[in-house]
């Protein structure tokens, strides 16, 4: 009787699907898809979610493949629920650079981000931002692996946190916590450095930050130092890749390389 009741409740919660299945008989709607996504999914079955960034007043659908005018989920990120790091590539219309490129604008801006899958909503708070090269040639054949979806080992997590703090344009009071924090990487274009990407970093269920101090020695890709005729103080640290767990029991590990991205 209890099982039957649960089944009945579950069926009633998704009763709206009957209408859409009748209207779109050739569409295979995922089990559990929310009603607010059904019409969009019927027209574009590569839809995997939605992103809303209050700080730049952007809201748009997320697709599983890149297309002009839409956000896209990284190929290594799960569409079902947040990974340790979920990466979303934004269209040009989402001007996150203007909202989060300085400590002053960051503090004044709404730092909230709502990342929605077809099944649930997840709230993030931006904690920092940085520039990364789009082409490996602009940083000695290297691209910082910010979009690592698999869980890192504790030591790799510490190294990753250090890598981020050096790259952040400013540092808030937030300290990343291993085995607790999940991150979102919002990757947009840059009008300041057209050859680079601008990346805003958010933490799941994080609180708005009220303090931020400009980083006086930002780690940029090598091309920035070349263009500005400066010596790169971080030149000996280029080439870091994380060690991640390769099994669900977290007993086996693997060191990633450029081929994994």
Residue ranges and their predicted role:
Residues 2-261:
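Solvent-exposed, non-transmembrane regions of membrane-associated and secreted proteins
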